[in-house]
Design a protein with these regions (language model features):
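Glycine-rich FAD pyrophosphate-binding loop
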Residues: 7-9, 21-41
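N-terminal FAD cofactor-binding segment of flavoenzymes
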Residues: 33-76
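Short beta-strand to alpha-helix junction loop
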Residues: 88-109, 227-234
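FAD/FMN-dependent oxidoreductases across multiple families
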Residues: 123, 230-304, 311-326, 330-331
Length: 438
């Protein structure tokens, strides 16, 4: 029986664990946290239909109180002079789910299908023979061997970060690759009537990042996010500002009240080695514009499990696993790379530049509602007259779209077979399309 070791109970790893255990693989998930502590104490948006497909549970069978509809949305410019409102109908309303019941559903699904779990066990490093991964070593000195290690241990995964250089997997984290966030749900002291209860701030208080204030039925959800680390003084400063603008925000934290680090860059071009496959945050599987990555991670778990099932009689070499790497980039990664170009172009502008784009309708509701999905070169050229009121800012966004589109085209056409030299040259072309954050 082929042995599968999943490092970390991330979304992608749990999906793969369930699929593989059901198909006769010997699957062990090693997770450093207690089972009951897994999952952020906040909500996220993703495709509920995909979760139903994975778990076999309809939305009516999801845990009671685990999800809700989110209200209408408004994006505010850095100066707060311009507000772009987005109104939803019965068919377009956004659904959000608490992360803890989501993780519980995925764990229960994997357990039901035969996967085994080892909680409260910290992984220290991979066990390697040359460039091949053979298992993991835990912090207490135990060694676990497997035919493949699925790395679902997050952006700072001790498996990935300690891989030998011969794997050629990129471990560098650059400024702008991560989003540092603090999020809490506060009690409400009043019940205001709001057209757009979910307010999103780009360059909030003129700092590179994104924040929001979402007034829910019983709580006020506040996110403070930046591309650079911040501490308690910044949180207090920002909460004072939010309470001034939203005086119904109370002092009591009902949920959350903690930091999170979210990858916001294009996926790794190379995420496999002999006996190793990265998935989820360890491979930067998120949408750069908004940090949403649950859908990408769930799909990655399905793709990886399919490749392993199809090749169950083979050694899980980089050449075999490249099929997973390639399929994910084609099916999921191409748009993420385009999205990064737009995100980095926006974050490289001074706040006055973002104000200009808002106030001259270069950025509109249709662009923001899809996290940049609806903004392309053709639509941007339709805003040429307004944009040319300040060519420097306008062409910075045009350049971001052009470079992002070029990267997306390359992501959609990775080398057909695993050949490191070809992969290196292809990856370097993609790196040449990257927009660097100033």
């Amino acid at each position: 029986m082929r042995k599968i070791l999943v490092a970390g109970a991330g979304h992608s790893g749990l999906v793969a664990a369930a699929e593989l255990a059901q198909n006769g693989f010997d699957v062990l998930v090693i997770e450093k946290e207690k089972k009951e502590n897994l999952g952020h104490d906040w909500e996220d948006r993703f495709d509920f239909g995909l979760l139903s497909r994975i778990t076999g549970k309809s939305i009516e069978e999801f845990p009671e109180g685990s999800w809700r509809f989110r209200g209408n949305c408004a994006f505010l410019s850095p100066s707060k002079r311009k507000k772009i409102e987005i109104f939803y109908n019965e068919n377009t309303r956004q659904k959000v789910m608490w992360r803890k019941p989501l993780i519980r559903m995925l764990i229960e699904n994997a357990e039901r299908r035969g996967a085994k779990f080892l909680f409260e066990t910290e992984i220290a490093a991979p066990l390697c023979e040359g460039a091949a991964v053979k298992g993991v070593k835990t912090a207490d000195g135990n060694e676990f061997y497997a035919d493949i290690v699925i790395d679902s241990a997050g952006v700072f995964s001790p498996v990935k970060m300690n891989l030998p250089g011969e794997t050629h997997i990129d471990k560098e984290i650059r400024r702008g690759d991560l989003f540092y966030g603090w999020r809490a749900y506060f009690n409400k002291t009043d019940r205001p009537e709001l057209k757009t209860p979910f307010e999103v701030y780009l360059y909030h208080e003129r700092e590179q990042g994104l924040s929001w204030c979402c007034t829910n039925e019983n709580t006020v959800d506040i996110l403070i996010g930046r591309i650079d680390k911040f501490g308690e003084d910044k949180i207090k400063e920002q909460l004072d500002i939010f309470r001034h603008d939203h005086p119904w925000t109370g002092e009591e934290i009902i949920n959350g009240g903690n930091y999170g680090v979210i990858p916001v860059r294009r996926p790794l071009t190379l995420m496999v080695a002999d006996g190793y496959a990265a998935a989820g945050d360890s491979a930067f599987m998120t949408m750069p514009m908004n940090g949403m990555g649950i859908d990408l991670s769930l799909n990655a778990g399905l793709i990886l499990a399919d490749v392993l099932k199809t090749n169950s009689e083979k050694e899980f070499t980089a050449a075999v696993l490249w099929e997973y790497n390639r399929r994910f980039l084609i099916e999921q990664g191409a748009f993420a790379s385009k999205n990064e170009g737009l995100k980095n172009a926006l974050l490289s502008l001074p706040y006055e530049g973002v104000d200009f784009l808002f106030e001259n309708n270069v950025i509109q509701a249709s662009d923001l509602s899809g996290a940049g999905k609806n903004m392309n070169f053709k639509t941007l050229m339709g805003k040429f007259v307004n944009g040319m009121k300040n060519p420097k800012y306008f062409f910075a966004i045009v350049n971001g779209l052009i470079k992002g589109s070029g990267a997306a085209s390359l992501y959609a056409n990775p080398p057909e077979k695993f050949n490191y030299e070809k992969i290196r040259k292809w990856s370097e072309k993609i790196e040449g399309k990257a927009v660097k954050i100033i």
